[in-house]
């Protein structure tokens, strides 16, 4: 029957850990790097007795009620067992003692230290000491000869020595080990051991085998090895009978041999692959205890038979029952008789083979009482004879074993995937319960410490910001083990005791009334396992697989079932995150699930029990939210993961804490995560997983790094930076979706940073001739950045790339228009707006503006032909257009206020034609295929009309604010501006236009900057890309953003261009270098229209029909 491996449990903090049994095997004694010696009644002992012996305990030995320890203060101390009372110091060294062992009688101990010395000390009289000198490096391990004649030692100098105790001389030395300068750097601690009783063999672990040296001759008759051993062996130990030898490797493998037959009897692998550093065989039972370098304790049951004989035990009653059930109703069959009659005669190895094979041939052979002469057969009479010989004494043991036929090794036994022990529930940012001084929680609000001494049991609460609440001291009368903290309350919980129910205790310090605490008892047989706080609510998960919700004032709310036992919980605002066991994990992996709920007015479940990703063979160590409300968690391998709401609520690794640790045994204890600024707040723990309460630990800040490939290259770095920025600004979309306030500048800065990175990656791909990759990068850009990419491709002479990018820009524009139309269909407010008294054109009525303008043009012609001119300057000739059926147009759009003449061609020339031609010019024949939607064109027309109205209407100038004055610098030059210059040159112009003319001229005389010229050049492009912009200030802001994206050379060229420009419009027109001939023709037509308009003003004596004919002619142009 193969050995049974029990689930390991936490024993000590990370570091070298040793284990031994007492003389009777009633106690398991362990010591570790936390300086404690613990006495376990068995592996399931939840409350082992603990004795602190120093800062670190390197080794321990137990014999005759004396417990000897080697500790970090360079001493070897003795304690009474099991009381743990100090009984003096046996010896001292100048450095740490690395190993200490008892002799067989228990009256002497041997200790080896890093100062190269080995000492043998009498336990009763420590003045009786012997010192052995000869090693040239720290001593690794020691072992007493059972007859107290020899002492074996291993050292970092690479030698194994055997000393004669009586004269303190070296009998023999073997240079078989790898040299090192210190114990911590040694590849193996080489825990050697003498064979019990006679001490005929000395076992030494060397590389991947165990060398056995014969006593006194010091020869090496044979080595023990196995094909399953792939790493260096660390330690060996003998069974009490001396027949079996167990060895542990640095990769967690435990192997057991039969020394006489050299057969490998057992192969057991550590569940997590940690190095085995402690092995101890039970004095009487077939049990081995072992420890690893992580401080864990494990047990192997049913290892081998310790009688020193080949097993001849009967088949167990359980196996008999199983076979009887199999042949139920056929008790008199030959198979049943065979099992009852011959069970005694079947050896263990034959039994294993029979049980292992399910073929019918084996059953037939067994029924015939004929095992045959195969290679695994054993004659029963010979076996009985050999067993009788073995009972004669220990000296005949080897001879009787050799008389047995040679048995070949059994084939490896595979147990299948091993289930992983379930992780126990825990509170995030808390330290283990067994510590007398521990943190119950450390978060962004404050700290809760728990002190559980023999004299005092109390809880201290400290707030980082004392304006929230002052520090609080509480008596821990109910033995609270769980605690959490928020800006509103302190929440504590305890498990049930003998007669006390499990309690939930809340101190609501933010309450405005005088009652500031409440308490709730759980039902019988229901214990609280995890708690958390949110905004206005508290939650508790219990052993009954229930989650109970409470208001912060103590009102019970919803109660719902959990799909499995809870592991941990966290709350933030209205969000509640629960991690629980979905099932049983295998091969060291945990099987966890996660639920994310929103507990606001509209309750919602975001994650429906999805599997929680963990690193292989790891467990959950921290669960919480970032300060901005994004769920995060950390596993035992140091991987920090964050919920990516932008990718279907998946989990993305954002940091590996282990990369920041300097030492192998160092860790970081996470206390909080921030997305803005991007900080991982944690406490460094030197040589342990948890920080001490005193002195107060300092918080360190780690940076985030996504695990992208080739981050040493420029491409990999920019890719990591881009997705890093995208991931860590997803919370802004979540805040906006849920109606929270946030700074718009943060999002704008993030978008700008992302677009700059995309442009850099596109430029890099362009240089590397990766044009297809350029298009892929452009697909991630915004509409404005795509236009910049098109310009870059054109200047780089990548014409095919520019064409592909143009097609992509057209697709993006079509998608944007489609999205806008869908939004308009879903939220159509036109009927609601038109039902009221206001007929102001809004963004919801934009598609109707074009038809309204066309209707107004038709009415203009009708009015100008039918009605005679009236010289009443206050009369509006478009009054018929403002009927109840048609909404009014923007004031000042199509009439002159100085003479009262109707200007029928203003809408056509100034609104429609320049808008189309300007856009066609800016695209430089690249975006010719893009069609403008009616919404964009009408928005542009409305914007240009708004810009012209201050010039056309003769209003008295008012004092301007600084913002308005600055905005006037960036006004686009329009035909109306040219008109005012003509009025200035003509002294016969009407005096009513003088204020506007003076104001416009004073603004035009100011020196222009490069940005102003660039904005005039690209104004139409900005308006076409952003149809929703209606304010001049917004146009300037958008222009400034685009101007900053330009390279330094381009900005400098615009500045030089502005310095060399003259004030005249003719020179300005020449410097702009218009390319398209259609624009020139349009400008000529505009000049002709202006001359005709001036002519109509001068000839006031002309009759009305002539003016009407002139107006009709100009309209047709």
UniProtKB/Swiss-Prot annotation:
Native source organism of the sequence: Mus musculus
Stretches forming WD repeats: 11-50, 52-91, 93-131, 134-173, 184-223, 228-267, 271-310
Protein's recorded name: WD repeat and HMG-box DNA-binding protein 1
Subcellular location field: Nucleus, Nucleoplasm
Residues annotated with N6-acetyllysine modification: 664, 953
Disulfide bonds: none
Cross-link (Glycyl lysine isopeptide (Lys-Gly) (interchain with G-Cter in SUMO2)) at residue(s): 390, 1116
DNA-binding region: 1004-1073
Key words of the record: Acetylation, DNA-binding, Isopeptide bond, Nucleus, Phosphoprotein, Repeat, Ubl conjugation, WD repeat
Placement of covalent cross-link Glycyl lysine isopeptide (Lys-Gly) (interchain with G-Cter in SUMO1): 1116
UniProt region (Disordered), positions on chain: 816-885, 911-1005, 1054-1074
Predominant cellular place of this UniProt entry's protein: nucleus
Residue(s) carrying Phosphothreonine: 819
Modified residues (Phosphoserine): 333, 377, 821, 910, 923, 1030
GO biological process, one term: regulation of chromosome organization
One GO location term (cellular component): chromosome, centromeric region
Stretches with biased composition (Polar residues): 873-885, 917-943, 962-974, 988-1004
Known role: Core replisome component that acts as a replication initiation factor. Binds directly to the CMG complex and functions as a hub to recruit additional proteins to the replication fork.
PANTHER family with a match to the protein in the record: WD REPEAT AND HMG-BOX DNA BINDING PROTEIN, WD REPEAT AND HMG-BOX DNA-BINDING PROTEIN 1
Stored Gene3D superfamilies: High mobility group box domain, YVTN repeat-like/Quinoprotein amine dehydrogenase
GO molecular function: chromatin binding; DNA binding; RNA binding; RNA polymerase binding
Compositional bias segments (type: Basic and acidic residues): 861-872, 975-987
UniProt subunit comment: Trimer. Interacts with the polymerase alpha catalytic subunit POLA1. Interacts with MCM10. Interacts with DNA2. Interacts with CDC45 and GINS2 subunit of GINS complex; these interactions associate WDHD1 with the CMG helicase complex.
